[in-house]
């Protein structure tokens, strides 16, 4: 399964490059891929980015086969492995990804943060992952990016593109124009050249059904957040792992602190279950997310799916 995922990613990068390539002249007999835009890789549920130490032990992109980012970079591709909340909702992750790319403070939005009773602002990225993204270069060409998401990372990048393209009417209505994040004002859909999703559960995840059938949904969510809260205020926070749950006060901002009392924060985040990746991966949550998302006709879209499920005995569900 891991080998299939690696092969699919390499094929995706090659296909994106060729699809976005300006046609060579008829006299050219040798074809060479041209990569003018960076590739941003976004992990899925319980995943991690290139900045976390666990990635040096087990690269998320590449796993036991080695670091795929290094491999692609050695082939001439400009690649980055972003880090977003492994348990966060598609909305929160899109906000975190935007801030990381731009080098600004994470803004979850006035309306959204009020609806789900958490802080509006998260951490600040003092250096943009992609300098001059969305600006014109010296030749007057817009500096764009390619987005590649695995599993729930695919939902994350689709949400990011939707907000870049259309913005958020709710956030624009709730926020002073002088104070609103550029993510919520729209008009930036052309900042993205392509969107590629790999094994993304666009219409819910099959793992949802056996968990619900066995009555484990609440327990799984509790254990996930309890573990995140412990690790997110330990010496491993911001180094080995990073859960990005400071908006709920459950984890500390690396190097800053600021987490709320543990059990208070744990109750807080569990009281807002619908603002989580676990909810967005349910049939109900996926339907709500999909209603928000549209296709930008000026962006190339690729989606790769694999059938590697096995039937679970007794309940008969494919997982």
Q: Which ranges hold each PLM region?
A:
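Sec-dependent signal peptide recognition
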Residues: 4-12
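Helical cap/lid subdomain of alpha/beta-hydrolase-fold lipid enzymes
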Residues: 162-163, 167-319
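Hydrophobic core
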Residues: 11-19
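Sec/Tat signal peptide C-region and signal peptidase I cleavage site
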Residues: 22-26
């Amino acid at each position: 399964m891991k080998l299939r995922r690696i092969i699919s990613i390499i094929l995706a990068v090659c296909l994106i490059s060729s699809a976005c390539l300006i046609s060579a002249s008829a006299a050219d007999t040798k074809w060479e891929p041209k990569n003018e835009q960076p590739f941003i890789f976004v992990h899925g549920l319980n995943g991690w980015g290139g900045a976390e130490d666990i990635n040096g032990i087990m690269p998320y992109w590449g796993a036991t086969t080695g670091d795929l980012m290094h491999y692609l970079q050695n082939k001439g591709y400009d690649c980055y492995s972003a880090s977003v909340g492994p348990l966060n909702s598609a909305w929160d992750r899109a906000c975190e990804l935007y801030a990381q790319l731009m080098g600004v403070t994470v803004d979850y939005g006035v309306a959204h943060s009020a609806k789900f009773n958490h802080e509006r602002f998260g951490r600040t990225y003092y250096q943009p992952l992609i300098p001059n993204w969305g600006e014109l270069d010296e030749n007057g060409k817009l500096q764009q990016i390619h987005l590649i998401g695995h599993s729930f990372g695919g939902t994350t990048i689709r949400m990011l593109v939707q907000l870049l393209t259309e913005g958020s009417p709710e956030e624009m209505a709730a926020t002073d124009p002088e104070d609103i994040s550029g993510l919520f004002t729209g008009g930036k859909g052309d900042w993205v050249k392509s969107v590629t999703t790999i094994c993304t559960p666009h219409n819910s995840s099959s793992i949802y059904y056996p968990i619900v059938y066995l009555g484990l949904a609440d327990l799984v969510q509790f254990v996930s957040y309890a573990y995140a809260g412990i690790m997110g205020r330990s010496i491993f926070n911001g180094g080995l792992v990073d859960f990005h749950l400071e908006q709920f006060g459950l984890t500390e901002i690396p190097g800053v602190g600021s987490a709320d009392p543990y059990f208070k924060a744990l109750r807080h985040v569990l009281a807002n279950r619908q603002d989580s990746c676990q909810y967005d991966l349910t049939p109900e949550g996926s339907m709500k997310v999909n209603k928000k998302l549209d296709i930008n006709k000026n962006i190339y879209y690729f989606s790769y799916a694999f059938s590697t499920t096995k039937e679970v005995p007794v309940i008969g569900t494919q997982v």
